[in-house]
């Protein structure tokens, strides 16, 4: 499953940002800023962005930690990391970001290394959610927070029907037009498999996070899991 998802993200790298725009009706930038704030990253911090994709969240973290801080952006898609590098090279001043090709289930970092962390649209796609949360817990410093943003199936039946209609009538046809129909077919099954908010809280607590809170946004079609390590 990991190799399959990795291949999907390598193939969709050229239109990855458009995908987020389509899925979020262009609102993902607002939600990413919310996630960065919930991570409590501060000037001078060493921060981590998991499943960094094309680098949008990592660049926002870099602005937050400033010139005296440092950010590590991690993804298993070499194509997306290349896009992220190109984006960061166009920034002025140059952000202090290291782009790392790695699996979030086996992070190449020391214990207690990071002051803050984010993950945007990644947890839903990992093969082993408890393992990824365990790794996140391991690399965070005591007292650090992480904010995990992702799409969800809303509990409201009408909103759930609207979400599925939108996927079927807009996102899939556009993907088909771009020749990426099979690549986008994973979205609905991934939403169906993804644990709901209270289940995410329980998983976070099981791996050692002292505090875990889930904030539904966009009428439950989106959510942010905020966790703290003590």
Swiss-Prot record:
Substrates-to-products reaction catalysed: demethylphylloquinol + S-adenosyl-L-methionine = phylloquinol + S-adenosyl-L-homocysteine + H(+)
Superkingdom assignment: Bacteria
InterPro entries, alphabetized: MenG, SAM-dependent_MTases_sf, UbiE/COQ5_MeTrFase, UbiE/COQ5_MeTrFase_CS
GO biological process, one term: phylloquinone biosynthetic process
Cysteine-cysteine disulfides: none
Keywords, alphabetical: Methyltransferase, S-adenosyl-L-methionine, Transferase
Listed Gene3D superfamilies: Vaccinia Virus protein VP39
MF-aspect GO terms: 2-phytyl-1,4-naphthoquinone methyltransferase activity
EC number: 2.1.1.329
Keyword Methyltransferase recorded: yes
Tagged with keyword S-adenosyl-L-methionine: yes
Pathway annotation from the record: Cofactor biosynthesis; phylloquinone biosynthesis
One Pfam family in the UniProt entry: Ubie_methyltran
Stated family: Belongs to the class I-like SAM-binding methyltransferase superfamily. MenG/UbiE family.
Role noted for this protein: Methyltransferase required for the conversion of 2-phytyl-1,4-beta-naphthoquinol to phylloquinol.
NCBIfam families for this protein: MenG_MenH_UbiE, PRK00216.1-5
Protein name: 2-phytyl-1,4-naphtoquinone methyltransferase
Organism from which the protein derives: Nostoc punctiforme (strain ATCC 29133 / PCC 73102)
Upper taxonomic lineage: Bacteria, Bacillati, Cyanobacteriota, Cyanophyceae, Nostocales
The encoding gene: menG
């Amino acid at each position: 499953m990991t190799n399959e998802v990795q291949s999907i993200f390598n193939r969709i790298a050229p239109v990855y940002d458009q995908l987020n725009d389509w899925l979020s009706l262009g609102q993902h930038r607002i939600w990413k800023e919310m996630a960065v704030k919930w991570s409590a990253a501060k000037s001078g911090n060493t921060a981590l962005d998991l499943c960094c994709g094309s680098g949008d969240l990592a660049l926002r973290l870099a602005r937050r930690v400033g010139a005296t801080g440092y950010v590590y952006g991690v993804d298993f898609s070499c194509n997306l990391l290349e896009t992220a590098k190109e984006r960061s090279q166009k920034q002025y001043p140059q952000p202090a970001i290291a782009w790392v090709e790695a699996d979030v289930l086996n992070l190449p970092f020391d214990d207690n290394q990071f002051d803050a962390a984010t993950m945007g649209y990644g947890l839903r796609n990992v093969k082993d959610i408890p393992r990824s949360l365990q790794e996140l817990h391991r690399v965070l410093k005591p007292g650090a927070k992480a904010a995990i943003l992702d799409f969800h199936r809303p509990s409201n039946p009408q909103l759930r029907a609207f979400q599925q209609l939108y996927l079927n009538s807009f996102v899939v046809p556009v993907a088909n037009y771009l020749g990426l129909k099979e690549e986008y077919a994973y979205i609905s099954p991934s939403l169906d498999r993804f644990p709901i908010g209270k289940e995410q809280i329980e998983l976070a607590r099981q791996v050692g996070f002292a505090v875990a809170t889930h904030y539904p946004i966009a009428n439950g079609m989106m959510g942010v899991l905020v966790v703290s390590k003590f």
